[in-house]
Amino acid sequence: YEKEISIHTTATSKDGEKTILAGKEVTIVDTVKLDGLKKGTKYQLKGWQMLKEENAELIIDGKRVENDYTFVADDEAMKVEITYTFNASELGGKNLVTFEELYDLSNPDEPVKVAEHKDIEDDGQTVLITERIIKIHTTATDKDGNKEIEAGKDVTIVDTVTLEGLEIGTKYQLKGWQMLKEENAELLINGKRVENDYTFIADKESMKVEVAFTFDATSLDGKQLVTFEELYDLSNPDEPKKVTEHRDIEDEGQTITFKEKPEVPEEPEKPETPQTPDTPHKPDSPKTGDGTNL
């Protein structure tokens, strides 16, 4: 009687979590406990990722997400790990289930399957990929941090943008432009939008970046401007993907107010004063007895 081999697997993130944030390089670790192995026998464990809802193999760039591990059993009971690293950018909200098969390689030409664990409903084998949600918060001021500024020819608005949930190593572009609050319309100066952008590679999950807008604000007395921002993921430069935005015309933090021009009172016309002939001035000559020391 040959002892049956039992197989039990648990899939997690590298940190042992059952959820992983969607990203371009995600790793699932499957810990496989085997019992009933024959010492000295060569085995191969083969695993792959399944989409739970579809009950179908996960295919990324036309390929199965799979891996294998070959070992010689040094004990009847062993624990081995198989890792799967793949691009999970588009898998937010999906449950992935790891399937495993164990082969006996005693005859390398004819591997024999001796055990498997393929249960699409098994929670232990399931990992949830969660949506990456990028939060954006912006504050617009002038260079000195003021929210109320003088209208003038050369005005700079600085928008300080706080981003959370970025994917480290990903190239992003922040695009911003100025809106007229009362009109809820883009600010056009000489027929052009007042806009700017900033491209960067995220080196942290949370970052603070600044975008500056310099323009002629001569005609904007009393107007309120609101800065709008959109963040794009440039992983595929041909298809930038908008990942978050902050476009709220009522947002105080994003609003700048230009001061009203002070009303200059019109001067009343002065009545014509008749020209008085110039009185000739005598030169100031020191008078005698004046006590002036000559």
Residue spans for each PLM region:
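Short glycine/proline/serine/threonine-rich loop/turn segments at secondary-structure transition edges
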Residues: F86-T98, F215-T227
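Intrinsically disordered, low-complexity repeat and linker tracts
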Residues: Y1-T12, I20-L21, V112-T141, E148-E150, ...
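Contiguous beta-strand segments within globular domains
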Residues: E17-K33, E148-T160
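Short proline/glycine- and polar residue-rich coil/turn motifs
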Residues: D68-V80, D197-V209
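Exposed aromatic-hydrophobic patches
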Residues: T31, K79-A88, T160, K208-D216
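Short solvent-exposed strand-capping/beta-turn motif centered on an Asx-Ser/Thr pair
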Residues: D35-G40, E164-G169
